[in-house]
């Protein structure tokens, strides 16, 4: 009937109806009131081809997203821009029109959920009444049409902020019904035998609700090995992934550790929570909400399939959740700094539990935004050769202060600083005594700006008359002005626990995580401060021989810990004594703080030895030495900088001799070597005088 009525219209009347329709309604199965709202502006399109089609629509072939105007349909091959008036852009050839649409409309658009809000020059902004009451058109100008509330925004930056405010309020549904109701298919990624669905633009946090970063794979594997090592101490563990996003980390815990863990995945974003639940069903895991299993999980599984485990998914603020419930393991991975969640994490964490903190605000931690580091962490830092370890000690100091405020101490299990993140994992020790011992390990660092020698300040509250005396170098006496700077406060104790790292290595071998085994081995060498040649990997058949070294998990101390947790009582005197003995042993074998970069301290006009040979030379000289994961060319050693340079010069060959033998260079006297080292230090100081911090 509608087609017959349309055919009865005269051609002139039909053309007038088409001109009056500025926006064409989208055909849908919705009711009539909903169809009245299903209108969107023609400047909002999915692809550039859809925008180009608007200018090439012929009569009788109207697209649902077209806006037809009599000016757009010119005779011949000339076409007018559908988003510009005739006065602004005259009709032109098709290739010029395509270039115009691409450069002046599509490239300056604002993207939201697969749609592009292109810039519009049509007189579609609301008119303004004057004093008399007559309506006058506003000044012709470019503007955007909001995809959510249909508002018109002039500037692109204002449009971005406008859409961002909608997202912060949770208003992500458009006020119209899209032309194609089918959503773009979600991509399925696989990592560690775990499948996850990800949204489009999943690697760009500004363009998606559920952020998934493939570059954080090492971080997720380190956290998994940490939890697997903790699961051997006591079972079951209450685990929390406070910022789930796609839920990949919690899914790996539940899928590979099974009944040893009770996983809770939390996220504040509703879309992320929905995606986490879908990923749970994808991996055959039941979703538990308020201690009740969702009936949907049983319907999705096919015949013969069984659920692997249960996961509790919550939607609330991470601080609120950590105040309401107690956990054995908490992982914090917010977008940016994590200092806003540390107090809540230590509020209800159980004794001997583990808190892992991932910080991605590397611009402030790596001394690129020093004012932000002062604001977030309350410390003063500068860019040094050991800036990555400096960042790790800054985060540990913030964690230690948060734990001390809750009458808890910490034991650092390991700290990793890589290109994209800083990961710190600590064990929680309850009691004011542990809190006081932890607070004493937060100290200031004295850093020489000329030679980059460094040392932690001595304990005590008395003001020292000349703090430069604490530095091993004599730059203050030979250089003018103030040569040192005070950094911190920082964590001054050890960053690694050798026994726990060996247990993590065993778990990585057990679960087949080959990507992080090299990193964990480097951490073990670094914690013991020994060359790699002195380390050997033991097979599972030799685990009984390695019980005292921490590879085998069920030791005597672990049995005492299990009994204590089962009884739910305070620590016995025997356990406190064993803990004190263990701390004394750890202090005696504590690795030296910080490291030296061999390239940074190279001698001008000399060829350096290979790094492996140089480590052997330092070890033969009686110093503890190892490589470090913080810097591929870094050397962790307890040798002072003067001795470090002396040995480096001793085994370096001059460049001008054309390969002089090492025996001739080694025959130089110690006095001559020392003089040459001092001369090289002075030359570098004069050359770098213009780059003082």
UniProtKB/Swiss-Prot annotation:
Location relative to the cell: Nucleus, Nucleolus
Catalytic activity: guanosine(27) in tRNA(Tyr) + 2 S-adenosyl-L-methionine = N(2)-dimethylguanosine(27) in tRNA(Tyr) + 2 S-adenosyl-L-homocysteine + 2 H(+)
PROSITE patterns assigned to the protein according to its UniProt record, in alphabetical order: SAM_MT_TRM1, ZINC_FINGER_C2H2_1, ZINC_FINGER_C2H2_2
EC number: 2.1.1.-
Chain sites annotated for binding S-adenosyl-L-methionine: 220, 267, 317-318
Zinc fingers (C2H2-type) by residue: 144-166
Function: Specifically dimethylates a single guanine residue at position 27 of tRNA(Tyr) using S-adenosyl-L-methionine as donor of the methyl groups. Dimethylation at position 27 of tRNA(Tyr) is required for efficient translation of tyrosine codons. Also required to maintain 3-(3-amino-3-carboxypropyl)uridine (acp3U) in the D-loop of several cytoplasmic tRNAs.
Protein name: tRNA (guanine(27)-N(2))-dimethyltransferase
Organism: Macaca fascicularis
Gene that specifies this protein: TRMT1L
